[in-house]
């Protein structure tokens, strides 16, 4: 009799736990292929850049230009002329022309490669977390490879301010588009 009583109690408890719950639909952010954040053009586009990597802080300028052979050239230098890095993007191929020593690590260069591919090429596996007319937050990856893109101040569909954060690595890049002088 005791085993039947335990079995009946177990069945009742299981029925109570499973039947009283309301159905929940957990809405997840859909991964999408997104358009490039910055459209590289034939003339040089200039951005004020602040790069923080661990205990190193660099301020300077990021210059982006699309060359005639569909190569996108990305150059970062300080205001005093020290070149921080010089990268090339052609289709899906990433090439490091030069890079300063603190950032010349395989994993850091791989992170920068995915960041710049997401900025200038069609981003893959991007989750758009928040979006409205003035702000957008995009997330790619997880763990140490997680990249969070904060886009704001949109003009003609492209952001004027971009902040890229890697929370686990203490690496952040902020880009503010420089206005072209009107004569």
Which functions belong to the PLM regions below?
Residues 1-10:
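Bacterial N-terminal signal peptides that target proteins for export
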Residues 16-19:
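C-terminal motif of bacterial Sec signal peptides marking the signal peptidase cleavage site
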Residues 21-25, 48-49, 94-96, 102-183:
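Mature, soluble, non-transmembrane domains
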Residues 25-34:
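Short, low-complexity, disordered segments immediately C-terminal to signal peptides
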Residues 40-73:
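Post-signal-peptide N-terminal segment of Sec-exported extracytoplasmic proteins
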Residues 44, 69-71, 82, 91, ...:
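Extracytoplasmic
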Residues 57-61, 82-84, 146, 159, ...:
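Short, surface-exposed coil-to-beta transition loops
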Residues 73-106:
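Mid-chain, structured segments of secreted extracytoplasmic proteins
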């Amino acid at each position: 009799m005791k085993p039947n009583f335990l079995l009946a109690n177990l069945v009742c408890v299981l029925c109570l736990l499973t039947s009283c719950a309301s159905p929940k639909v957990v809405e997840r952010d859909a991964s999408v292929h997104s358009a490039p954040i910055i459209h590289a053009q034939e003339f040089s586009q200039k951005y004020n850049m602040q790069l923080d990597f661990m205990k190193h802080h660099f301020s300077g300028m990021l210059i982006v230009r699309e060359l005639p052979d569909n190569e996108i050239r990305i150059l970062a230098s300080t205001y005093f002329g020290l070149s921080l890095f010089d990268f090339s993007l052609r289709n899906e191929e990433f090439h490091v022309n030069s890079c300063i020593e603190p950032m010349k690590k395989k994993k850091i260069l791989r992170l920068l490669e995915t960041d710049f591919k997401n900025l200038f090429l069609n981003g893959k596996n991007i989750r758009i977390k928040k979006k409205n007319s003035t702000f957008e937050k995009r997330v790619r990856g997880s763990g140490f490879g997680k990249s969070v893109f904060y886009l704001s101040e949109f003009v003609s569909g492209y952001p004027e301010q971009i902040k890229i954060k890697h929370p686990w690595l203490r690496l952040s890049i902020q880009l503010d588009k420089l206005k072209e002088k009107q004569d």
